[in-house]
Amino acid sequence: MSTLAVSAHTPAFRRPTMPTARCLHHMMRGHLAIRGDLVAATGLSQPTVTRAVTSLVGAGLIHERPDLVRAAGPGRPRIPLEMAPTPWLHIGAAITEDGGTLGFFDTRGRILRETTFPLGTDTPDTAEHLIAGIHRLLSRLAVPVADIGVAATAPHTGFLGERLTEEFGAPVTVGDLTASLAAAELLTTDATTDPILIIHLDRGLTLAVANDNGVTTHPVDSDLGPESLARHLTNADILPGQKRRGFTGLLPAETPQSPELRLLLDERARELGETVARLTQDTGARTVVLAGPGFTVDPDGYRKLAATVNPNVDKRTAIRIIPDAATLARAAARTVALDRLLSDPVAVHAGLVDRNQL
């Protein structure tokens, strides 16, 4: 019987700080490494790296490959290290206005299984859809669950965490979806002095800023949500779609674009561009990622948006759009699924042992 508290963890969403986590993070991004590589990559001392490697080997997260030793002159041979296949998995889910995505990941962050699940009429109903999806995927895999992470756009994270912990007896991490996207960007870099800005437009506009201190999120008071678009469409006598909720319900992919609709959407793209430029200036970001259906619902508006943004931000600023919902959801799910592993990897192994899963 699990002795876990029925509550969810708050994700760290920062670069790894523990020596074991820093070494593992470096190895997750490559293949083979020797201890000297880890010293150079992490800036840690040789003794600290040696202790971290010993702990990671003991936890079954990495192993030595003496068969790959190459002669390199006098002295002790430098034995390559490699991430080991682990007998457990990490579960991540992303819940947006358009639906849920569920993924099973290994310790490298590679996707093992993936599916989608519908949103319920309320938070408890959505939780049951997620739980059913996890059970379906687990029925095909006789592998223990190290932890479960959920990234959500709605403020119902407390109930989700409690329900998932109750059902599966594994540690649960629940966090903000926009923050998880910012953390995903942060974890692809070794160091940065300039902020990374994520602007996510779904049911409302939310921004997350990532830097060396971690990730902070900020709701933005704006009139750019789906309700505003619905109002403009109605006032222009353009009937909004009724198939799905949110932006994609208002403008399904097959929506014919009349001159009146295109004019309305171009004005909206201009307003979006002004907002993106202002937020980029306010945060001093040099990397800006635009995410969510509020941006992708109108790909024909990208040029108008860019024409508004580019003259008003530093030319060195890199701006891109996450092109589709699947890419966004997978990035968020992976990041929150691996948050505990990248905070304290040895503790993940110890937790499985304590729960008699290994």
Q: Which residues fall in each region the model found?
A:
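ATP-binding/phosphotransfer module of carbohydrate and carboxylate kinases, centering on a glycine-rich
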Residues: 1-64, 74-77, 82-106, 111, ...
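Short loop/edge segments at beta-strand edges and connector loops
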Residues: 64-66, 174-178, 323
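Short, solvent-exposed loop/turn elements at beta->coil junctions and helix N-caps
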Residues: 67-71
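Short glycine-aspartate micro-motif
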Residues: 80, 90-94, 147-149, 195-200, ...
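N-terminal phosphate-binding loop and adjacent alpha-helix
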Residues: 113-143
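Glycine/GP-enriched mid-protein hinge/lid loop-to-helix segment characteristic of carbohydrate kinases
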Residues: 114-116, 122-126, 162-263, 328, ...
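Amphipathic alpha-helical regulatory segments at dimerization interfaces
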Residues: 129-140, 163, 188-189, 271, ...
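Short beta-strand-loop/turn "lid" adjacent to the catalytic site in phosphate-handling enzymes
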Residues: 138-162, 282, 286-294
